[in-house]
Structure formats: structure tokens, C-alpha cells
Amino acid sequence: MAIILITKNLEEEINKKFKKESIKIFEHIYSLKENPKKGKEIGVVGGILIKELKHKNHRFYFLVDGYKIKILSIKELSNCVLKFVRMSDKNTQQKVINEIKDILRKIGEEHFT
């Protein structure tokens, strides 16, 4: 099983915005433990793959080691870490993707805590 990490800021944002529905969203996110290859690839910055997971009109962005996710089988991805960092709706999708890429280029993954 993969390891799922959600930044504190994103967790608070999900709970604030979705209230009761946040339980379903977290279940959807944690379903990646069993199938870490789920989600749409958005881009790669320095070997870090940016992917999105959709839930209705919202997208949740996570970072993963691009080499592991592409090469290893699902069974071999037991120590793979998926780090959820941001959320957007359809209107702000491209802006958020560009922000994630910019942060990864300038500062690196450590900025997302």
C-alpha cells in the first residue's frame, strides 16, 4: 500500500469548504492507498510527478516520485508516498497547476507542509 500525506492547510481547506461531504472526499483520496496509479498526470518538475484526482467539480493535486509510479507495479509501490498539496475548482485549475509547478521549480517539495 502507498502512503498518503495531506498537508495541514489542504486538510483544513477541505473540512471548511465541504463540511460533511469532506468524509467522502478523504475516502476518495485514501483509496489511492490501494491503487496509487489512479489520477490524471498533469506534469513533471525535477522528477516529481504532479497528478490530479477529481471529485465532482473540484480537483485535488498530489505529488509523487515520477520514476516509481511509472516503472513499478501496484504491489511494488508499498513505500511510495503520495503528498496531496492543493485543491481547485474548474475555474482556477490552471492557475493552481502553475503555482504548484512554480513552487517546485523554485523551492522544492519541502515548501508543501
Each predicted region: which residue ranges?
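General secondary-structure edge motif
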Residues: 5, 9-12, 33, 42, ...
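Enriched for short, Lys/Arg-rich terminal
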Residues: 4, 58-59, 64-113
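Membrane-targeting and insertion segments and their boundary/processing signals
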Residues: 2-6, 24-27, 36, 70-74
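Arg/Lys-rich, positively charged N-terminal/basic patches that mediate binding to nucleic acids
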Residues: 1-25, 104-105, 109-113
